[in-house]
């Protein structure tokens, strides 16, 4: 890591990493470094004057750079670039059969790192293990890394139709085009509901039977909820939880264990077969949301940086929507009951069991805004809370260099028993407990230099202070940088 600190007394910190970068263009009047060859570099803090290359000048770090006040730049490695001779971890695909006809698809990398910590990634809604390719190829060089597809999503969809047609229906000319739209449930699919409780149990099986030891578990959006839920109910299987813009709510219907009387008021709990009315609604909704144009629009919403190539993610999502079980699985997911524990209850349970939690949130997420991450920070003050800008709902795919840098640093911090400093605290004497630390993070990507802003919020940084600062930042953006 290298920190270039402006107008401050230089200190020294040494971190080594390999890099090979051919810069296509150096921007005039901007600090740039050109690396050539694959070699070990000693990176230290440097002081000097610079105009500060900041992406997103409307935020706090952008205003600091324009005013010429003190700010810092942290240089981190990019993703492994095989075209430049760097070695990326190889990804392999596998399946395991949890229950009859229910195969769990997963990807893994770095399994030759026998003594390294185990890391498990859980996907968000509508995607799968493929969404963590940039973590598998990079973090897989140092750790043993897995990413799974939740049942009912990705490549963990049913391998057979969970329903059958009656003789009367099957003989009619108008046969259902989708699996799961039959009249009778197959024995193996009896009481099958793609719910939070099912996914929690799926993760338990995977950790116990496939990985075989406690893991560092990370989840984005829905995957974050499942990761926290799993850690709350199985803390002995978890070494730490990373929440990547985790959704704090899922399941709109009452859980039958938690609220049995209330649950009976809702006749269909998301199991197969789908009721006739649900079939008709599902067909209409599915026709819209599975349309490639709709998928492209959703990706445009959740990715802040529209220069990022999401073609591979787009094609994988479209591919999954064409599976015959996709529509019925979608209906089951959307109408499934909530979990036995709410997000807040799972968080409290993790706090009671001293489960280590780290928060990494994209600041420009239009769905799970950083406000939710700051509420978690309020409940667990000692949890490191990192905010990245510009980054949206999927920071692990939009700015994987930053997320991987934070993941490595956090795991090292825990593995060392706290001896290794958290990311951004390696070379600072700032009183970060009462405030927040902001840095400009620069990294190579596709031969160019790219920069984002990163903040670490202190343990005593209050929730309401964060709300006030967010309001102030929005106010300044609206009124053109004028302070109130």
From Swiss-Prot:
EC number: 3.1.1.-
Keywords noted in UniProt: Chlorophyll catabolism, Chloroplast, Hydrolase, Membrane, Plastid, Thylakoid, Transit peptide
SUPFAM superfamilies named among the record's database cross-references: alpha/beta-Hydrolases
GO BP term, example: chlorophyll catabolic process
Domain of life: Eukaryota
Temperature dependence: Optimum temperature is 25-30 degrees Celsius.
Group of enzyme by EC: hydrolase
Localisation: Plastid, Chloroplast thylakoid membrane; Plastid, Chloroplast stroma
Boundaries of the annotated transit peptide in chain numbering: 1-47
InterPro entries documented for this protein: AB_hydrolase_1 (IPR000073), AB_hydrolase_fold (IPR029058), PPH_chloroplastic (IPR044211)
A GO molecular-function annotation: pheophytinase activity
Recorded coiled-coil stretches: none
Principal place of residence: plastid
Phenotype of the disrupted gene, per the record: Stay-green phenotype during leaf senescence. Delayed chlorophyll breakdown during developmental senescence.
Functional note: Alpha/beta hydrolase dephytylating specifically the Mg-free chlorophyll pigment (pheophytin), yielding pheophorbide. No activity on chlorophyll. Belongs to the chlorophyll catabolic enzymes (CCEs).
Subunit comment: Interacts with HCAR, RCCR, PAO and the LHCII complex. Part of a SGR1-CCE-LHCII complex, which acts in chlorophyll breakdown.
Record family assignment: Belongs to the AB hydrolase superfamily.
Name this protein carries in UniProt: Pheophytinase, chloroplastic
Species for this entry: Arabidopsis thaliana
Organism lineage: Eukaryota, Viridiplantae, Streptophyta, Embryophyta, Tracheophyta
């Amino acid at each position: 890591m290298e920190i270039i600190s402006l107008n401050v007394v230089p200190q020294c910190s040494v971190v080594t990493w390999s890099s090979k970068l051919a810069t296509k263009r150096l921007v005039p009047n901007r600090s740039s470094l050109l690396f050539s060859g694959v070699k070990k570099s000693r990176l230290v803090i440097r002081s000097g004057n610079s105009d500060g290359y900041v992406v997103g000048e409307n935020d706090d770090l952008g205003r600091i750079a324009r005013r010429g006040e003190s700010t810092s730049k942290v240089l981190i490695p990019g993703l492994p670039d095989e075209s430049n001779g760097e070695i990326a971890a190889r990804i392999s695909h596998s399946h395991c059969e949890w229950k009859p006809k229910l195969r769990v698809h997963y990807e893994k990398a770095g399994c030759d790192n026998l003594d390294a910590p185990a890391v498990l990634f859980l996907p968000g809604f509508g995607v799968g293990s493929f969404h963590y390719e940039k973590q598998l190829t990079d973090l897989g060089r140092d750790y043993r890394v897995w990413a799974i597809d939740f049942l009912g999503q990705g490549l963990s969809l049913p391998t057979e139709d969970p329903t059958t047609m009656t003789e009367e229906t099957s003989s009619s000319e108008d046969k259902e085009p989708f699996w799961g739209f039959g009249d009778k449930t197959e024995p193996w699919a009896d009481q099958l509901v793609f719910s939070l409780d099912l996914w929690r149990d799926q993760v338990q099986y995977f950790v116990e039977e496939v990985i075989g030891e406690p893991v560092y578990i990370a989840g984005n959006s829905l995957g974050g909820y499942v990761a926290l839920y799993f850690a709350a109910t199985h803390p002995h299987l978890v070494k730490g939880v990373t929440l990547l813009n985790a959704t704090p709510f899922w399941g709109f219907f009452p859980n039958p264990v938690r609220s049995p009387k209330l649950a009976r008021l809702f006749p269909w709990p998301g199991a197969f077969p789908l009721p006739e009315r649900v079939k008709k609604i599902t067909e209409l909704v599915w026709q819209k949301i599975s349309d490639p144009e709709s998928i492209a629009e959703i990706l445009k919403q959740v990715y802040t940086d529209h220069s990022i190539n999401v073609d591979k993610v787009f094609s994988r999502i479209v591919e999954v929507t064409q599976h015959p079980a996709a529509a019925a699985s979608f209906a089951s997911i959307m109408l499934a009951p909530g979990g036995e524990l709410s997000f807040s209850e799972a968080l409290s349970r993790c706090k009671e069991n001293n489960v280590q939690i780290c928060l990494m949130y994209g600041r420009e997420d239009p769905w799970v805004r950083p406000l939710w991450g700051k509420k978690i920070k309020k409940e667990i003050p000692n949890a490191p809370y990192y905010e990245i800008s510009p980054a949206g709902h999927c920071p692990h795919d939009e700015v994987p260099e930053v997320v991987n840098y934070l993941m490595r640093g956090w795991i090292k911090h825990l593995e060392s028993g706290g001896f290794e400093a958290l990311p951004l605290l390696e070379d600072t004497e700032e009183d970060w407990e009462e405030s927040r630390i902001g840095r400009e993070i620069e990294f190579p990507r596709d031969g160019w230099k790219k920069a984002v802003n990163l903040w670490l919020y202190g343990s005593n940084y209050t929730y309401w202070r964060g709300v006030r600062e967010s309001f102030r930042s929005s106010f300044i953006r609206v009124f053109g940088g004028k302070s109130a």
